[in-house]
A protein has these predicted regions:
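Extended acidic/charged loop-beta regions that coordinate divalent cations
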Residues: 1-41, 78-93
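ATP-dependent carboxylate-amine ligase
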Residues: 37, 43-48, 60-70, 74-236
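Conserved phosphate/anionic-ligand binding catalytic regions in large, soluble enzymes, centered on
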Residues: 50-56
Length: 236
């Protein structure tokens, strides 16, 4: 709101969308439309920063397209980023009282955004399941686990279904290098096979824990997670 470019744009009476406290505000001249973040489920009361940014972009696009504000509000309040609406985009699930998050992030910027989001959620012991895209630069693959190593207690590395030109085990080796001297991570494990890695992480979870699963085979991995969570719910 107070950024010089934004302030100038607003002072000139142009359209702006910005965050003001716990709300997203659309403004034009003296006119205002306020949307409370508590009414937008995907932001978790404004705690998930990248979702707040997504909401701002959505509001701006819908406003620019001329949609009625009632329609915009209804869309924001009713949208749920589950595996059906937004597969692999911060899909939250419950597994025996633990929080499981599935995401398709595969670059350092995504890791930073995910860590910031996870930090805003409750969680006792925190674990992450990760592979790496072989067609990225070595330093980008390493940097992902440098970031994760400061935020998670346990890291499970698994080898992608497609190595994208990398040799066997090469990506996992780069990921492990990024964990050297990690500030928080105390346990690292390498596993061949995405679903085996997921099952290993799930089987260790206790109520109140949190696990971030960075999926590779999006549809198949989400279906596997949904099945495991459903089975856990029936067993409970």
């Amino acid at each position: 709101r107070h950024h010089p470019v934004m302030a100038t744009h607003r002072a000139q009476g142009h359209r702006t969308v910005y965050v003001d406290g716990d709300s997203v505000v659309a403004a034009e001249g003296s006119w205002r439309e306020t949307i409370h973040l508590r009414d937008v489920p995907i932001t978790r009361n404004g705690k998930i920063g990248f979702q707040v940014e997504n909401v701002m972009a959505s509001v701006a696009a819908a406003w620019g397209a001329g949609l009625p504000w009632q329609t915009i509000r209804r869309g924001l309040s009713g949208f749920v980023n589950d595996s059906d609406n937004a597969p692999g985009r911060f899909n939250l699930m419950d597994f025996k009282g633990a929080t499981v998050i599935a995401d398709y992030g595969h670059n350092p910027d995504a890791m930073r955004a995910l860590v910031a989001a996870v930090d805003a959620l409750p969680g006792n012991r925190r674990s992450v399941v990760i592979s790496g895209a072989g067609d990225r630069r070595d330093e980008d693959i390493r940097e992902q686990t440098v970031i994760l190593g400061a935020a998670f207690d346990d890291v499970i590395l698994y080898q992608d279904a497609a190595q994208r030109g990398r040799g066997d085990g090469e990506v996992m080796a780069l990921l492990r290098e990024g964990l050297a001297g990690a500030a928080r991570t105390r346990h690292v494990e390498e596993i061949r096979g995405e679903f085996i890695a997921i099952d290993t992480a799930l089987d260790r979870l206790q109520p109140g824990d949190l696990c971030l699963v960075l999926v590779d085979q999006v549809e198949e991995a989400l279906a596997h997670l949904a099945r495991r969570c459903a089975e856990a719910g029936v067993a409970a």
